[in-house]
Amino acid sequence: MTISPQYIWNQVLDRLKLRLNPTAYETWIASATVQTFQDNCLVIQVENPFILNHLQKTYYSLILEEVETIVGYPIAVKLTTSQEQNLRIVDKNKDNLSSTKLQNKRQQESPKLNQLNPRYNFSRFVVGPTNRMAHAASLAVAESPGREFNPLFLCGGVGLGKTHLMQAIAYYRLELYPNANVFYVSTEQFTNDLITSIRQDSMENFREHYRTADILLVDDIQFIEGKEYTQEEFFHTFNTLHEAGKQVVIASDRPPKRIPSLQDRLVSRFSMGLIADIQVPDLETRMAILQKKAEYENIRLPRDVIEYIATNYTSNIRELEGALIRAVTYISISGLSMTVENIAPVLNPPMEQITASPEIIIQIVAENFNVSVEDLKGSSRRREISLARQIGMYLMRQHTDLSLPRIGEEFGGKDHTTVLYSCDKISKLQKKDWDLSQQLSELSDRINIASRNQN
């Protein structure tokens, strides 16, 4: 007798309901539905990526245990989202799609689009008084690159939306023109590419790559300070693109004139277009950001909770959204209802980043990735160890004042170029990988807590 997928899942739900507190069950499990049971694999669909991420981290082993108990033998369980399911349905019926839909599908599969964070688009950017000009200028550049505001210089503190707007410009153009040469890079990536081309005697390839861009977007240009040869090469790249009517967009945490050791001619070039300043969002904008974030992640938030978080987290958007995730996670784990009284203990006061010891950082990263401290300090190239080591280097750069060579020493005598590569890689990955970004935020919180307790 063949057991139906629905029967299996109904039995699993009944067992999970007994093992979990009611709030956790209703929040994370109840809405999940069974899709198929083929080739010893049960496919379970959930509503959104946020729930998917939490289930995989927190409840996957429990679900697998109960499924195997019902079935009676080892099988695989795959968790998926409704968005992924819809994409598969579209693919199966592609012969019936209009030419417009086929074109959109091809655009979504563009390799350049895949390098961007799909959450960083114009529709998800909340406009307020402190970022209105930057948003309007970015949209104008996306619609008609090279005509107005060239270059566009986005200026603002950490976590205020500069990267969001830059990637939104790239996303907008690539959706319309998948084959356009739209390059979004960090200043460190530009520098690393330059160093590699010098070592490999391939400067012509480097120049051809960057100087044939239709739109060049360079993030964190403040890190060009003190790099004379990088400034020289970027100056000529800028001139070539600008003279050809191509668009250049630059982002920095400070205006051009305040970037130390920046060549005067670059200050002049960066200032010849529009410098759009982004300030800390006001209370109403912060509340709107939280509301939109909750809607996209399918989270129900009482208005007083939104107002409480928005009132207490004022520095930047990244901190604001991190507080929301902490509150939702705490409520789901504790089984409490979502009220100001229940979330206040974990959110108030806001977690401030403090200087941590290298030992604390390495220990927390090792525990998180289930590897040993010796693994992190060793030379193993196993994927899970290598990634954990790179994340450890990135976090050490964020939470300490150590130089790159000193960080390398803490990880078993690694070269400073290895540390730079690792930090740049994780910095770029977190901008397009929401799960990694949240993981880094959680690790930072643990590092801060451990450091505060040590002090």
Swiss-Prot record:
GO terms for molecular function: ATP binding; ATP hydrolysis activity; DNA replication origin binding; lipid binding. It is found in: Cytoplasm. GO terms for cellular component: cytoplasm; plasma membrane. Residues 1-73 are annotated as: Domain I, interacts with DnaA modulators. ATP binds at G159, G161, K162, T163. The keyword Cytoplasm applies. SUPFAM superfamilies: P-loop containing nucleoside triphosphate hydrolases, TrpR-like. Pfam families: Bac_DnaA (PF00308), Bac_DnaA_C (PF08299), DnaA_N (PF11638). Residues 115-331 are annotated as: Domain III, AAA+ region. PROSITE patterns: DNAA (PS01008). Domain I is involved in oligomerization and binding regulators, domain II is flexibile and of varying length in different bacteria, domain III forms the AAA+ region, while domain IV binds dsDNA. Oligomerizes as a right-handed, spiral filament on DNA at oriC. This is Chromosomal replication initiator protein DnaA. It comes from Crocosphaera subtropica (strain ATCC 51142 / BH68) (Cyanothece sp. (strain ATCC 51142)). The gene is dnaA.
